[in-house]
A protein has these predicted regions:
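A membrane-topology feature that recognizes alpha-helical transmembrane segments
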Residues: 1-158
Length: 158
């Protein structure tokens, strides 16, 4: 059900690590394919509430990420905001609790990535400068996968 988002997140993460950019066309394409899957499921099951919830949670997540990017320019780019919107669509499909877990994991993994970057700069690792950017798409994707796996495990435990 979430395979389009997983494939898109993997591709975006690799591209972000490789080039420090997130192609918006990839984000849009992945989000549209995932949305088509959700719309089909909603039509087959005659249930639009879940679709509405995931759309609201995705937009809210993107809005929060956008505010963070505006408040602290240079830390997050617009690609990270769009990646959050697309990923939020998938995580939002699972409900509010997985979205909250996702945000917690993004915070933990994001701070870990910053800590690793600072340590690399302190030890003068070749290729690091004061301007070294941290690819955030892998953080967004990893946090999403973690929250989805934990959500799936909690469903199996019931």
């Amino acid at each position: 059900m979430l395979l389009p988002s997983l494939i898109c997140m993997l591709a975006l993460s690799i591209e972000d690590i490789r080039s420090r950019r997130i192609p918006r066309l990839w984000v849009f394409s992945g989000a549209m394919v995932q949305l088509i899957v959700f719309v089909c499921w909603s039509l087959i099951n005659a249930d639009g509430r879940r679709l509405a919830l995931c759309l609201v949670l995705a937009l809210l997540s993107a809005a929060i990420q956008f505010l963070m990017a505006v408040i602290r320019p240079g830390m997050l780019g617009f690609g990270d905001v769009t990646c959050t919107a697309a990923t939020g669509l998938a995580v939002g499909w699972l409900g509010l609790l997985p979205v909250l877990m996702w945000w917690c994991f993004m915070g933990i993994l994001g701070l870990t990535a910053i800590g690793v970057a600072v340590l690399r700069m302190r030890h003068n690792t070749p290729g690091t400068t004061r301007q070294t950017q941290i690819p955030f798409a892998p953080v967004i994707a990893s946090a999403a996968v973690l929250s989805c796996v934990i959500d799936a495990m909690s469903l199996l435990a019931v």
